[in-house]
Amino acid sequence: MRPTPKVEIWKSPVPYLFGGLFLLVLLIALALLSLVCTHQKPSSSSNNNHMDEEDDVGDKDAKPITREYLPKIVVILAGDNKPTCLAVPVVVPPPTSIFRCNCDNVTVIST
């Protein structure tokens, strides 16, 4: 009778492949678990809602920001050593409708 040969499993790349895959899945699961555990849900208690209402009342009395306190933006043009323009942000109102039709301003180009 012949002796049975020993099978050395670690000479094959398969255990390393599955081991690495297992570690990767474990790492992803731990990351997701930590995200779920640290996610803060807003509390729905009546005490907190009452405090939020008081904060909203104070916001109505707030003064609008004057123009001198608005942030100024410096625009440096190419080739200039000093800033040449100061820009002030402008609030643009949203359009009244999503689809604007400029049918009156159609220009016909003849070829």
From Swiss-Prot:
A cellular-component GO term for this protein: membrane
Residue window of motif VIMAG: 75-79
Instruction: Give the compositionally biased regions (Polar residues).
Output: 40-49
Is Iron set as a keyword in this record? no
Judging by the UniProt lineage, the source's domain of life is: Eukaryota
TM ranges: 17-37
**Segments on the Extracellular side according to the record's topology features:** 1-16
> What coarse category fits the chief subcellular location reported for this protein?
membrane
What tissue specificity is annotated for this entry?
Expressed in the vascular tissues.
Gene Ontology BP term (one)? regulation of amino acid export
Could you list this entry's UniProt keywords, alphabetically sorted: Amino-acid transport, Membrane, Transmembrane, Transmembrane helix, Transport
Question: According to the UniProt topology, which residue ranges lie Cytoplasmic?
Answer: 38-111
User: What membrane topology is given?
Assistant: Single-pass membrane protein
Cellular compartment(s):
Membrane
Query: What are the start and end residues of every segment in region (Disordered)?
Result: 40-63
Domain comment? The VIMAG motif is necessary for the function of the protein.
Summarize the protein's role: Probable subunit of an amino acid transporter involved in the regulation of the amino acid metabolism. Stimulates amino acid export by activating nonselective amino acid facilitators.
The entry assigns this protein to a family as follows: Belongs to the GLUTAMINE DUMPER 1 (TC 9.B.60) family.
**Miscellaneous notes:** Overexpression of GLUTAMINE DUMPER 6 leads to free amino acid levels accumulation and plant size decrease.
Q: What is this protein called?
A: Protein GLUTAMINE DUMPER 6
Organism whose genome encodes this protein: Arabidopsis thaliana (Mouse-ear cress)
